[in-house]
Amino acid sequence: MLGVQAQMPAPGQWTTPPFDPRFPNQNQTRNCYQNFLDYHRCVKTMDRRGKNTQACDYYFRVFHSLCPVSWVQRWNEQIKQGTFPGKI
């Protein structure tokens, strides 16, 4: 986990996400969606264990860099309404 922390820029400085070997193709739609899921799963797990969610910030930064704002807003609304199709 130390390697991930070393890659994170200071708050407010957004950079291009590093290469993820799970998504080698140019189309990054799946990468966006997977990092959105990973972030919410991480937050849920850390909250359940009573730990700090700062470790989840990496996923937050990646999906905010890759995903269109309209998608994120729609997914967050679906989560609040209980209609989000992904497993969190």
From Swiss-Prot:
Motif Cx9C motif boundaries: 32-42
Tissue distribution: Testis specific.
Single GO biological process annotation from the record: oxidative phosphorylation
Chain residue ranges for the region called Disordered: 1-21
Pathway: Energy metabolism; oxidative phosphorylation
UniProt xrefs under Gene3D superfamilies: Cytochrome c oxidase, subunit VIb
Localization (cell): Mitochondrion inner membrane
GO cellular component, one term: respiratory chain complex IV
Family membership noted in the UniProt record: Belongs to the cytochrome c oxidase subunit 6B family.
Summary of the function given for this chain in its UniProt record: Component of the cytochrome c oxidase, the last enzyme in the mitochondrial electron transport chain which drives oxidative phosphorylation. The respiratory chain contains 3 multisubunit complexes succinate dehydrogenase (complex II, CII), ubiquinol-cytochrome c oxidoreductase (cytochrome b-c1 complex, complex III, CIII) and cytochrome c oxidase (complex IV, CIV), that cooperate to transfer electrons derived from NADH and succinate to molecular oxygen, creating an electrochemical gradient over the inner membrane that drives transmembrane transport and the ATP synthase.
Subunit structure: Component of the cytochrome c oxidase (complex IV, CIV), a multisubunit enzyme composed of 14 subunits. The complex is composed of a catalytic core of 3 subunits MT-CO1, MT-CO2 and MT-CO3, encoded in the mitochondrial DNA, and 11 supernumerary subunits COX4I, COX5A, COX5B, COX6A, COX6B, COX6C, COX7A, COX7B, COX7C, COX8 and NDUFA4, which are encoded in the nuclear genome.
PANTHER family (UniProt xref): CYTOCHROME C OXIDASE SUBUNIT 6B
Descriptive protein name: Cytochrome c oxidase subunit 6B2
Species for this entry: Rattus norvegicus
Organismal lineage: Eukaryota, Metazoa, Chordata, Craniata, Vertebrata
Gene transcribed to yield this protein: Cox6b2
